[in-house]
Structure formats: structure tokens, C-alpha cells
Amino acid sequence: MIDITHKPTTLREATATALVTVSDPATITAVQEKRVPKGDVLESARVAALFGVKKTHELIPDCHPLPIEHAEVGFTIGAQEITVTMRVRTIYRTGVEVEAMHGASVAALTIYDMLKPIDKGVAIGGIRLAEKK
């Protein structure tokens, strides 16, 4: 792990996104109407994203354990896609970019897992860091 003891403690922010696409608009309708057999897709993905952010250092070898001061996840629903937006903030010596991307990824995987029984064409793509401060 890189030595960060010499770095100053400052406000660190990162926003990441992930895109989940579906093959049938009826899948999006099922999500919106909470008719997916496995349960409430967006609430499950929200909880999973928060767990993902908090556990990043346990799964990514060179990530430091750091205090997560704020984490929020949002969902933008389109005709055949759901965009996950994950924002993370801390006051620490290192950034939270990987934590934000990990949270967005875990949310996307949760959505995928919950939708695969009703839509065999679900796909995840476009996981990226949208902003870093």
C-alpha cells in the first residue's frame, strides 16, 4: 500500500456512474411498479451500493480503509436503461474515487441480479469516474 502519512487531510469527493441496460421496456415498467419477483430493485441496489462503498478496502488490495463521511446513490431511469450515480465524500488523506466506482458497480450488479430472471438481455456497462474533487 502507498504511504499516505505525509499527505494533508482535506475534503475529498468523487462521483461515479454505471449504466444498466435492459432488452425490454417492460422490465423498466416492472422496476418502476415494484413488480420484480426478487423485490424492490432500486432500494436493494441502494443498500448494496452503500455496503460496496464501505467495504472497498476489504476487496481492492491497495485501497486504504478510510472514514466515509457521506455516501449517496441515485438512479436515473430511461426507456431501457438505469443509470446509477454514486457520490462519496470524506475528509482524509486519500481520495474516494475507487469507493465511488465500487459502490456504483455493486449497485449495477444488484440490479442485474434482480432483473436477470425477467430479462435475459440485461447488461452492465460504462462504469466510470464522472467527477473528482
Per-segment meaning from a language model:
Residues 1-64, 69-133:
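C-terminal binding/interaction regions
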